[in-house]
Amino acid sequence: MSASLISALPPCGNEPPMPDEWRLYRLATRLSTFANWPFTEDCACTPERMAEAGFVHCPSDNSPDVVKCFFCLKELEGWQPEDDPMDEHKKHSPSCLFIALKKKAEELTLSEFLKLDLERTKIKMQKQMNQHIENFQAKANVVRGHLEKLDADETQ
């Protein structure tokens, strides 16, 4: 199929109908997350350049400059005005397939897009699985501590 995914989908309002996660492939969607970005002028890490590098802005009260790549889920913070978003992304997540793209997401064929999104989904699922494992291990450690305390109490 030679038509790009986004141009092949029928329009619905202002945007083609697609899952929210797919909307993040669009530069404008990522850029819209940078409304309160602390660096806007006379710097390398402008909202436009951050969004072009695949980042979405996800600030917290303690960290107003936290960003996350929508694809590889790498989170970065502590930005300085001279930091180049693409260079930082490549340095901290060199295997991110989004930054390795040789064309815009809008230019991908349906097949290319689906293969790429399959990889994004695998990354997301791996991260979720790792979080579940960490939570399980933390709870297991608490239970182990209680069991050891019970055992120690019984042997006294």
From Swiss-Prot:
Record PTM Phosphothreonine, positions in chain: 46
Give the record's keywords alphabetically: Cell cycle, Cell division, Centromere, Chromosome, Chromosome partition, Cytoplasm, Cytoskeleton, Metal-binding, Mitosis, Nucleus, Phosphoprotein, Ubl conjugation, Zinc
Whether Phosphoprotein counts among this entry's keywords is yes
Indicate which residues the UniProt annotation says bind Zn(2+). 69, 72, 89, 96
**Entry PTM:** Ubiquitination is required for centrosome-targeting.
CDD domains registered for this protein in UniProt: BIR
Q: Name one GO molecular function term.
A: nuclear retinoid X receptor binding
Q: Which Gene Ontology BP terms does the record give? A: cell division; chromosome segregation; negative regulation of apoptotic process; negative regulation of DNA-templated transcription; vasculature development
CC terms in the record's Gene Ontology section: chromosome passenger complex; cytoplasm; kinetochore; midbody; nucleus; spindle
Q: Tell me which family the UniProt entry assigns to this protein.
A: Belongs to the IAP family.
Domain comment from the record reads as follows: The BIR2 domain is required for vascular development.
UniProt-recorded name of the protein = Baculoviral IAP repeat-containing protein 5.2
